[in-house]
C-alpha cells in the first residue's frame, strides 16, 4: 500500500502542512483541523492510529483523520541536517522568520514536492521524512525507522 502525502504551504500561518491523500480526495489534502502545536490534545490521535499500515517511522498523527500536524519551521537551526546541508533551505527559512524577502511560497512548495518527495520515492530514504516531521511535530514516532521506498507525492 502506497503512502501518499500532500505537501502544502499555508502562507497565512507560515506553516508547511503534510497531509495524507485519500483515494476519495483526488489529490487534495484531507480536510480537518490541524490543531494547536503547543497544546497536545489526546483526542487528536485516535487509539487506532493506523499501525496496521506498516508505515514505519511516521508519527502517530500521520494516521489521524485530521492529518499530520503542521510543521512549523521557525528556526534555521532545526533544518541544519545532512538532508539539506547542501541546500539553501535553512537560510531561506531563517530569512522568512525575520520577515525578510526570501524564496516564494510557490518555490518552497516546489522544493519539498519535487526534491524531497522525489528523493524519498527513488532512494527510499525514509530518514528524510523523519527529520522533517520531528522538526515541528509534538507526536512521537510509531516505531523505529526501517528502509522503505513506497512514498509518493501528491
Curated annotation (Swiss-Prot):
One of its GO terms (biological process) is symbiont-mediated arrest of host cell cycle during G2/M transition. A fraction may be phosphorylated in insect cells and HepG2 cells, a human hepatoblastoma cell line. Phosphorylated in vitro by host protein kinase C or mitogen-activated protein kinase. N-acetylated in insect cells. It is found in: Host cytoplasm; Host nucleus; Host mitochondrion. This is Protein X. May form homodimer. May interact with host CEBPA, CFLAR, CREB1, DDB1, E4F1, HBXIP, HSPD1/HSP60, NFKBIA, POLR2E and SMAD4. Interacts with host SMC5-SMC6 complex and induces its degradation. Interacts with host TRPC4AP; leading to prevent ubiquitination of TRPC4AP. Interacts with host PLSCR1; this interaction promotes ubiquitination and degradation of HBx and impairs HBx-mediated cell proliferation. The gene is X. Pfam families: X. Residues 68-117 are annotated as: Mitochondrial targeting sequence. One of its GO terms (cellular component) is host cell nucleus. The keyword Transcription applies. Multifunctional protein that plays a role in silencing host antiviral defenses and promoting viral transcription. Does not seem to be essential for HBV infection. May be directly involved in development of cirrhosis and liver cancer (hepatocellular carcinoma). Most of cytosolic activities involve modulation of cytosolic calcium. The effect on apoptosis is controversial depending on the cell types in which the studies have been conducted. May induce apoptosis by localizing in mitochondria and causing loss of mitochondrial membrane potential. It comes from the Viruses. Keywords: Activation of host NF-kappa-B by virus, Activator, Apoptosis, Host cytoplasm, Host G2/M cell cycle arrest by virus, Host mitochondrion, Host nucleus, Host-virus interaction, Modulation of host cell cycle by virus, Transcription, Transcription regulation. Belongs to the orthohepadnavirus protein X family.
